[in-house]
Amino acid sequence: MNNLAKWLTLVLIVLTTPARAALDIVITEGVDAARPIAVVPFVWQGQGPAPASISDVVASDLSRSGTFKTLDVRALPQSTISSVNGFTAQNWANVEAEALVVGTVKPYGADQYLVSFELIDLVKAQLQAGKGPQNNNELLLESRETVISANQFRQYSHRISDIVYEKLTGIRGAFLTRIAYVVVKQGQKAPYHLMIADYDGYNEQMLLRSPEPLMSPTWSPDGRRLAYVSFENRKAEIFVQDIYSQTRTLVSSFDGINGAPAFSPDGKKLAVTLSKDGQPEIYVVDIATKATRRITEHYAIDTEPSWFPDGKSILFTSERGGKPQLYRVSLDTNKVSRMTFEGEWNLGGSISPDGRSMIFVNRTNGKFHIARMDLATRFMQVLSSTQLDESPSVAPNGTMVIYGTTHQGKQVLAAVSMDGRFKARLPVGQGEVKSPAWSPFL
């Protein structure tokens, strides 16, 4: 068995071992270097207890982004402020934070609430402190109010996080996104579960339960469908499933391997790995007509296709050079060019949404880690420091990578920032979780 075949067998074995569905995020590195920000509890202007804590969600989002660290509310000079009108610059003169998030929540009819929030520029406030009277409204970076229903608190909290993140970084936030992943609970009649959840593990939903392995989930560009590989019929088949209607479509069921689906940027086609003509090769399948087009032709294994953002090329893993490496094939000319040369193996690659970086699994000295290559300079940086890393998936804003890894002998999910500075682990209770796929913007 050659090296790539052994790797594919290892991935299959890993995917068929034990899992828990609830995901938590434990930050392991990178907090000290993050940008400080203050988030105070939103003031509840109604009777009885507040229906939800928006500030807790916003603070957690910003901390998990790897860009910010939220300050302890107990150490803030004004922890009950609700708007810039109650802001006193002198009180914040010695607080090391660049911005402050404040807000209010009040009843607005049956099961509805008016949520207001403001983003205050603390840097500007501190520069102006001591210069006499000032107009606090000049300190506002953002101010919004929205009416939401009782079941929208968490969703709108993520929306606030998106707004704050983009205002302070210039990069669109990805807190309203979701992840898909595979859970395996051994001992059950149908131990293989295809799950989706909010990016932070909340609002988990099971899409499919099967007695046979499920693997390789991938999102459509519109975020409405998932493609995945199922062995429910005792053979590898590729399905596309609408996550809202639950409608499933069988796309590929040839003899042999049907694997590694990847949606084209227009959502109309899948790049897949098929062995119907002999060796595993890269094909493109039209989802509507099921028509197939062979893209590669080589005696070595070609697998793990991934599209470039312009839809004109496909990245894939091949052993045609003797060891697993990443290659690019043009869909116009079928010309193949090698992309990676450092390390022993490089595989499982994908291109960042902006087309500037390639994320992949690198094996050096027998250790598998997540790596990033700048496509302009070809500089490679190893991002992760965990073990047996696999299945990297990039956030739609290109700032974070979620991937599968091993922690204390169990398969778990982990995350790392694109600069490698911030690291987090998504621990589980019983069983294992793997094969993560980050959704597009929703």
From Swiss-Prot:
It comes from Shewanella frigidimarina (strain NCIMB 400). It holds the Pfam family TolB_N. Keywords: Cell cycle, Cell division, Periplasm, Signal. Belongs to the TolB family. Its main location: periplasm. The Tol-Pal system is composed of five core proteins: the inner membrane proteins TolA, TolQ and TolR, the periplasmic protein TolB and the outer membrane protein Pal. They form a network linking the inner and outer membranes and the peptidoglycan layer. Gene3D superfamilies: TolB, C-terminal domain, TolB, N-terminal domain. SUPFAM superfamilies: TolB, N-terminal domain, Tricorn protease N-terminal domain. The keyword S-adenosyl-L-methionine does not apply. HAMAP family: TolB. It is found in: Periplasm. This is Tol-Pal system protein TolB. One of its GO terms (biological process) is protein import. GO terms for cellular component: periplasmic space. Residues 1-21 form the signal peptide. Transmembrane segments: none annotated.
